[in-house]
A protein has these predicted regions:
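Residues at the starts of beta-strands that form the adenosine-phosphate
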Residues: 41-43, 88, 115, 144-145, ...
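Catalytic-core segments of class I nucleotidyltransferases/pyrophosphorylases
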Residues: 117, 136-140, 167-255
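N-terminal glycine-rich phosphate-binding loop and ensuing alpha1 helix
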Residues: 1-70, 94, 130-134
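Short, active-site-adjacent cap segments at secondary-structure transitions
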Residues: 51-54, 124-126, 247-249
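Active-site metal-binding loops of divalent metal-dependent hydrolases
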Residues: 4, 123, 253
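Well-ordered alpha-helical segments embedded in enzymatic catalytic cores
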Residues: 27-31, 102-106, 224
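Short loop/turn motifs at secondary-structure junctions
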Residues: 39-40, 112, 141, 175
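Conserved beta-loop-beta/alpha segment of the NTase-like Rossmann-fold superfamily
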Residues: 63-67, 74-165, 200-202, 208-211
Length: 255
């Protein structure tokens, strides 16, 4: 949640893009709820400057709660309290905006030696879907790392990372044999796009530490995953779960 939200200026000039409302709650709340629904209750949010509103949203406001209770506005009280009871939330600023890989690397101390999930705030997944639960199960079974994949029209693949895959007999997940960041339609290995959900083995941290800046001078998570996918030993291997449900891109005004 450390991006600048430039595509939604001027609305995001003084308010984080993650706090833009989707129906009756900010976009970031849907993402946190998705994590909690998948059994994840220790959540670290990587933020940036001018993003204090994210912390405030998930904090309690006793005066507001008392006022709603006294006014008999029980439905509103319940909706306010829901955001403050979603799990154990922690916050860490990214500092230098050096890309997604750098943001993930900032979580190293908090995560330690455990597999962990990365959920990008730009992607909202229908709450009726069990994508993250399926990804966690695939990670536990393979011992590697798992990315979420979604079919897109080939002419749109240049907006995503594209995956080369091969089937795994008897399993619903696939083996990812290669990743290409934002390829042209002609160079893309498939029309399977990487979307903003990852379940990663902690070995990714040591790979990220050795990953040089790539496109745009940023540390690309895709580059590190490519390296880890071709490695051997504990934590090696890259797999994908193909998502066929509804996804909304909060970074796209027309999504």
């Amino acid at each position: 949640a450390a991006g600048l939200g430039t595509r939604f200026l001027p609305a995001t000039k003084a308010s984080p893009k993650e706090m833009l409302p989707v129906v009756d709650r900010p976009a970031i709340q849907y993402v946190v709820q998705e994590a909690v629904s998948a059994g994840l209750d220790d959540i670290l949010m990587i933020t940036g400057r001018s993003k204090r509103a994210l912390e405030d949203h998930f904090d309690r406001v006793p005066d507001l709660e008392a006022s709603l209770k006294e006014s008999g506005k029980d439905d509103l009280l319940a909706s306010v309290q829901q955001a403050t009871a979603l799990g154990e939330l922690h916050y860490l600023r990214q500092g230098d905006p050096k890309g997604l890989g750098h943001a993930v690397l900032r979580a190293k101390t908090h995560v330690g030696d455990h597999p962990f999930a990365v959920l990008l705030g730009d992607d909202l997944i229908d709450e009726k879907e069990d994508l993250l639960t399926r990804m966690i199960a695939a990670q536990q079974k393979t011992g590697g790392s798992v990315v979420a994949l979604m079919e897109v029209p080939r002419e749109q693949i240049s907006a995503y990372g594209a995956a080369a895959v091969e089937p795994v007999e008897g399993e619903e997940y696939v083996r990812v044999t290669g990743l290409v960041e934002k390829p042209s339609p002609e160079e893309a290995p498939s029309n399977l796009a990487v979307i903003g959900r990852y379940v990663l083995h902690p070995r990714i941290f040591e790979v990220l530490e050795q990953t040089p800046p790539g496109r745009g001078g940023e540390i690309q998570l895709t580059d590190a995953m490519q390296t880890l996918g071709q490695a051997e030993g504990e934590g090696a291997g890259m797999y994908g779960v193909v998502f066929k449900g509804r996804r909304f891109d909060t970074g796209d005004k027309l999504s």
